A protein has these predicted regions:
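Multi-pass alpha-helical transmembrane bundle typical of ion/small-solute transporters
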Residues: 1-278
Length: 278
């Protein structure tokens, strides 16, 4: 819900949409991502961080408990935290403790670690150059005309950012659920018959894809309004042109990493983009 609010906080800040309309707009495009993106991020979460064959329900439980405790502690002490990264770390910890480093997929972990740093930097750099290019193109236009134009364009930029957010964040959850189902499908008849076909290899069932995208859209509707209003008010000085450039830059970063199968933080990405636009 917090990341959903981040995805369209700028259109509330610039008064393009009310908080209610903003969360409905975000929810629609969160779900629409199901028709555009594959499940590369889900596969990374399921088999690109730890060896899927080593996973069992106890390790998943430990991963979830560990990440929840860490997020709660950081929130309690006012420390900025990415839930996505906490979940990834929570998965690595118990697997490493139980099986050692041989059960870890080093290439996947390195890729994620690199993009923890790169995703906000890419967002910031794209934001800076997008803002510079926009200012160059519209330097001779009247400020009021430019503001009106970019209020309209923010509908597009917020939509594609919500697409990127949906593609990345929904797949993180489906990857964790899929690996849990994969781990028990061999020994649980109900799971293998009705929930997860035991093919011997990791995959993401269609029903799970639809469910995760539906849940992220519903979560945006149910809990996003309060958070997005707070974020929007906090960004009250942001102009429509800045909002457009930040969202477009953040969207390009999120969609690019989703295609590459790299789970990144929506919060960190949009923060970097906002810094980049100044």
């Amino acid at each position: 819900m917090n990341d959903a609010a981040n995805s369209i906080a700028t259109i509330v800040a610039t008064r393009v949409f009310s908080p209610t309309m903003a969360v409905l707009w975000a929810a629609f495009w969160n779900f629409a991502a199901i028709f555009i993106f594959g499940v590369s991020v889900a596969h990374t979460m399921g088999e690109g961080i730890v060896e899927a064959s080593r996973i069992n329900e106890y390790l998943i439980f430990a991963a979830l408990i560990g990440s929840v405790i860490w997020v709660w502690l950081c929130t309690h002490f006012g420390m900025p935290i990415s839930v996505s990264h906490a979940l990834i770390g929570g998965l690595i910890g118990p697997v490493w403790f139980t099986f050692g480093s041989d059960a870890l997929v080093a290439s996947g972990i390195i890729k994620i670690a690199v993009f923890i740093v790169l995703s906000p930097l890419i967002g910031m750099i794209l934001g800076f150059f997008t803002m510079c290019l926009t200012m160059l193109i519209f330097r001779r236009k009247h400020p009021l005309k430019v503001e009106g134009l970019f209020k309209g364009l923010q509908l597009f930029s917020s939509a594609i950012f919500s697409l990127g957010h949906g593609a990345n964040d929904a797949q993180k959850t489906m990857g964790i659920i899929a690996i849990l189902l994969y781990s028990v499908a061999g020994s649980n008849t109900f799971v293998s018959e009705y929930l997860y076909e035991n093919t011997g290899s990791f995959h993401v069932p269609v029903w799970l894809i639809v469910t995760c995208y539906s849940v992220i859209a519903l979560g945006t509707i149910v809990g996003g309004k309060k958070v997005i209003k707070t974020l929007g008010d906090g960004l009250a000085r942001l102009k429509p042109v800045q909002g457009f450039c930040a969202e477009t830059s953040g969207a390009l970063t999120l969609m690019g990493t989703a295609v590459l199968g790299i789970p990144v933080s929506t919060t960190h990405t949009i923060t970097g983009a906002i810094i980049g636009v100044g």
